[in-house]
Amino acid sequence: MKKMMLGNEAIARGMYESGIHIISSYPGTPSTEITEFAAKYDDIYAEWAPNEKVAVEVAVGASIAGARAAACMKHVGFNVAADPAFTASYTGVNAGLVLCVADDPGLHSSQNEQDTRRLAIAAKIPVLEPSDSTECRDFVKLAAILSEQFDTPVILRLSTRVAHSQSLVELCEPENVPNKPYEKNPGKYVMMPGMAKVRHSFVEKRLKDMSAWAESTAINPVEINDKKIGIIASGIAYQYAKEAVPNASFLKLGLTYPLPEKLIRDFAAQVEKVYVVEELEPVTEEFCKMLGLSVIGKDILSLEGEYSTEMIKKAILGVEDAVFTQDEQLPVRPPIMCPGCPHRGAHYVLKKLGVTVTGDIGCYTLGALPPMQSIDTCICMGASVSMVHGFGLADPEFNKKTVAILGDSTFIHSGITPLINILYNKGVGTVIILDNSITGMTGHQQNPTTGYTLKGDATNMISLEKLCEAIGVKRVRVEDPFDLDGFEKAVKKEVAAPEPSVIISRRPCALLKGVKFPGPISINKDKCVGCKMCMRIGCPAIVLKNGRPVIDSTLCNGCGLCKRVCKPNAIGTEE
């Protein structure tokens, strides 16, 4: 039977069919759905870990114990997981270990555009790169096999388009893969210097063996057509190139690290001109040039963003197809917090107070955009807490006018240790944890503070208050961000305090089931004075018509925040 599947769903299917029994992940676009789809299979144990480092360590432990395992994350998540991943490359595996890492060319939902192949090369971990959903399924199964055959973790590198595009996938029955017996082996699994030195030699030999395997594998196919143009491509870039220059000769790389030297040389010898088409970093291009081959790549193709069929066609053939354009372009719709978003109240107060805000990764990062513009920085998960300490060290005056904000899931991910750092080093800083009872931006995933597992089972719920108190924070308070006056007083008081403090801004995400508001809200035209204070909260339901604010009832969910900022009391709940 065949089924239309997202690339991410096909990966989950491949895990099921290949006998991968354990998956530990942290949600991150565009990788999130892999673990969510995998959780639907009864034969797979799937969990959300507090962060990617923990997820990879869980998967490594399961693999060494004898069960095929996987961990899934986005590209910046692999930075977090690098510590165990790099050393797991030395230890190798017992049962198959697959690391699914999704890159984000074009920065659809990320803070940078890094190429996972660079880290994989540094870690000496092989990389498989599918170009469609069928290959997603097939390559996961192959990854598990290669992992055991070559005693190595294997990275499955995705891109946003492969992860979120659909194509037909043939469904197969799952393999019966029993757990392998565990044998105590300190020389392999205890990476003290003496053992690690021996394992490093093993890793270098493993790469040579895999390079030899890459010379004849079916996932690196050669297609000779018109010999004037030869294209070496991988991943989604292969699909674009194939559509742009269908008559060209192709070397499609399914294994993008380590690369096959002889296969590439032989292909280049058969064509007049070689183009290397790869999104982001020129990894394959640099390898070809290292071999002394004359290839064309980033000198005509971009180092940045996503590719397209049109871009490649223009670059290689110099042909620019006529593209339909409208006489009038639709206005750009910027990303914005949802109607009823609990973070809106917190941002409104912080903007009003004029404090410096070190921000973090999540829905609340949108507070950096107009009209709020309350966030000053956004670097990575948990950085807000470390940076508020850094601000205070640079100038103690910042302690009186700077706060860190981060979400509940982000705090669990990477916010606890920097808060400990503030306490340990006698710092002064105010941390605001925006607790909306869910991991919001990646699509409502559970986390350790929600009380539910990935599969919806009730579990231990971590109390943010008790956690902060347990590490030594004496000033911990919970506030409702829609109580604007109370929230403002709390921020003023805690920022002025000469010691570390935590404000937990607690109100559930407006999109959660069970969250109810009083009802639709409207503006009384007779009372409205046109001050536009309600526009300052940035609610998409409030628009200007003829210079006066109007509430769009199709978008308004009745949260009532606009009522709280309206001084003339012109906004009220409809009868």
Question: How would you label these PLM feature ranges?
Answer:
Residues 1-133, 161, 224-225, 290-504, 514-515:
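Thiamine diphosphate
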Residues 1-8, 17, 130-337, 342-343, ...:
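Flexible, low-complexity linker and terminal segments
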Residues 43-50, 91-102, 182-185, 424-437, ...:
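A glycine-rich helix N-cap at a beta->alpha junction
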Residues 37-43, 241-251, 466-472:
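Short helix-loop-beta junction
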Residues 34-37, 60, 81-85, 107-114, ...:
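Short acidic, glycine/serine/threonine-rich loops at helix termini
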Residues 72-73, 98-102, 155-159, 232-233, ...:
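Short beta-strand segments
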